[in-house]
UniProtKB/Swiss-Prot annotation:
Top enzyme category: transferase
Residue positions binding (6R)-5,10-methylene-5,6,7,8-tetrahydrofolate: 183, 282
GO cellular component annotations of the record: cytosol
NCBIfam families: PRK01827.1-4 (NF002498), thym_sym (TIGR03284)
The protein's annotated pathway: Pyrimidine metabolism; dTTP biosynthesis
Positions with a binding annotation for dUMP: 22, 180-183, 191, 221-223
Organism for this UniProt entry: Vibrio cholerae serotype O1 (strain ATCC 39541 / Classical Ogawa 395 / O395)
Keywords: Cytoplasm, Methyltransferase, Nucleotide biosynthesis, Transferase
The protein, known as: Thymidylate synthase
Family (UniProt): Belongs to the thymidylate synthase family. Bacterial-type ThyA subfamily.
GO aspect biological process, one term: dTMP biosynthetic process
EC number(s) given by UniProt: 2.1.1.45
Length: 283
């Protein structure tokens, strides 16, 4: 929690104002932030200085793992995080590749599970990684990549957290996740949970021990309409100790994650938190 608050304070103190063309808003911005999560010792990085809704973050991750491309599927899992980008983004609404209501296009999990090959067919990046790690293989390229510039025009949003690189040292699994851009008051709350849970899940279904998850953010920013709440409310609060995250031990395989797993298979204990803060969201 301290590293999260340190980043927020750094942006407030050292950030530079940048005009964001996509949203039409100003952002207070810093370049490069590195966060580390101790998954092996179950130090769950859930924000405590405001109430955080971890279930939606896990549901979104499950949707990525399943390769979903429709906001309705994400809602069925338990999150509305894609409703706005799928249905309120004017550029996407005018895009000829949009298939209709709730369609997200070829974003995130679609790239992870069905990356289009130039000679036809698709590559299932995630399955390859799971198969390798399950056999104890680390080819130094166990990388799940969502960033496909050749298909940006076919999706409602470029990926923000675009790369997850898994590494084995003995029987301990590590993760390096890279994020090009982060709305720190809103998005980072989700992204920290997802990086942590992704390593925990991958370790469980490949029979490895989870180690550390490293989370790099390139452009970390606070939107102008979020600044007052961050500076004058959230940063004035004292954080609580980290809670713990629990996964149903019956989850054994990638197929389990693809089929029967729901939010009921996850739990958080020991979570103390301050009152919620309603930060504005920028589409």
């Amino acid at each position: 929690m301290k590293q999260y608050l340190d980043l927020c304070q750094r942006i407030v103190d050292q950030g530079v104002w940048v005009e964001n063309e996509r949203t039409g808003k100003r952002c207070l911005t810093v370049i490069n932030a590195d966060l580390t999560y101790d998954v092996g010792n179950n130090q769950f990085p859930l924000v405590t200085t405001r109430k955080s809704f971890w279930k939606a973050a896990v549901a979104e991750l499950l949707g990525y793992i399943r390769g979903y491309d429709n906001a309705a599927d994400f809602r069925q899992l338990g999150t509305k995080t894609w409703d706005a980008n799928a249905n309120l983004n004017q550029a996407w609404l005018n895009n000829p590749y949009r298939k209709g209501e709730d369609d997200m296009g070829r974003v995130y999990g679609v790239q992870g599970r069905a990356w289009a090959k130039p000679d036809g067919g698709h590559i299932d990046q995630l399955k390859k990684i799971v198969d390798d790690l399950s056999r104890g293989v680390d080819d130094r390229g166990e990388i799940l990549n969502f960033y496909n510039p050749g298909e940006f025009h076919m999706g409602c949003l470029r990926p923000c957290m675009y790369s997850h690189h898994f590494s084995l040292l003995g029987d301990t699994l590590y993760l390096n996740s890279t994020q090009r851009s982060c709305d720190v008051p809103l998005g980072l709350n989700f992204n920290m949970v997802q990086v942590y849970v992704f390593l925990a899940l991958m370790a469980q279904i490949t029979g490895k021990k989870p180690g550390l998850a490293y989370h790099k953010i390139v452009n970390a920013h606070i939107y102008q309409d979020q600044l007052e709440l961050m500076r004058d409310v959230q940063l004035k609060r004292e954080p609580f100790p980290a809670p713990q995250f629990h996964i149903n031990p019956k989850i054994k395989t990638l197929q389990d994650l693809e089929t029967w797993v729901t939010l009921d298979d996850f739990d958080v204990t020991g979570y103390q938190f301050h009152d919620p803060i309603q930060y504005p969201f920028s589409v």
